[in-house]
Amino acid sequence: TRDGIVKGIDLYTLSNTGAYGEHGPTTVGLSGHKSIPLYGKAEAFRFVSDVVYTNHMSAGAYRGYGATQGLFAVESAVNELAHKLNMDPIALRLKNTVQEGDVMPAYYGAVNTSCALDRCVLKVREMIDWEHKYPARDMGNGKIRAVGMGMAMQGSGISGMDVGSATLKLNDDGFYTLMIGAADMGTGCDTTLAQIAAEVLDCPLDNITVFGADTDSSPYDSGSYASSTTYVTGKATEKCALKLREQICKLGAELLECPADAVEFDGKVVFESADPTRQKTLSDIAFASQFGHKIPLEFTETHTSPLSPPPYMVGAAEVE
């Protein structure tokens, strides 16, 4: 509309998949499924794609996996639309961005359960000082500086399919061991998953030793792909940490000879709520767990999700 409301989106993608099909349909699918949903006010959309064989190398998975190409096209079109409407491209986007609670167009009918895209746009506008730099500035000596921006989204694994598992235990020295099936391929997932456990257990990151993927001994994980590890394996790690924390309190209460609901755990000691001077250190509890107690201080948990909640991104650039 003339006031900047996007009523419909029509996207066509042509994908060169090389000499073999392999990831052809899924890659081209994401060019629409990870771009159209950004504009939640659209009342209708059409997404058509063709995948063609050529004599090029086979095309497979790479970071972004089709989403980046679709996003470049859609975001470029939105910027052109803003120019035709004589409207600030950020203002145009803020009128149309998907909101929490919206059914996302072209995203399998999923409801957007968590979203701060509009706030992300505003933050980027502030960071690049958009109000003083848009659309362009004459720097003299024939130089012009201009600013531009765009939005993006991804997913968090393949819904209903990806599986992540983790094993977490308390050692007799009061430190923790986290065993995961996810492979750290430079993404830092060993650190990320340890941070999740450390937050639940109220302990320093250095108190957790991570043993990465070893198919002979690690719990099962379907793979480190599709931006799934932090969400899927991370949730399994959180489940482990919550159960382990509960059992630490239970054993601590047993050693203090009081009910489990009468104690608290601060990451270092389990203490009686009514009398904090009565306490057992984590080392005491870990040591006691080795002597015939029926309370396990080791848990393995698995997580999968029927949804693939999208993280959102906004970028801006100043070019000369």
Language-model segment annotations:
Residues 15, 45-50, 167-169, 204-229:
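Flexible glycine/proline-rich, aromatic-decorated loop/lid segments
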Residues 26-37, 61-96, 108, 119, ...:
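Alpha-helical support elements that line or immediately flank enzyme active sites
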Residues 97-175, 301-306, 315:
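Helix-loop-helix junctions that connect adjacent transmembrane helices in secondary transporters/permeases
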Residues 1, 13-18, 98-102, 153-155, ...:
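Acidic, glycine-rich active-site loops and adjacent beta-strand->loop/helix elements
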Residues 2-11, 38-40, 70, 77-79, ...:
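Structural beta-strand/beta-sheet cores of well-ordered domains, especially the beta-sheet scaffolds
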Residues 135, 260, 272-310:
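Internal maturation/activation junctions in enzymes
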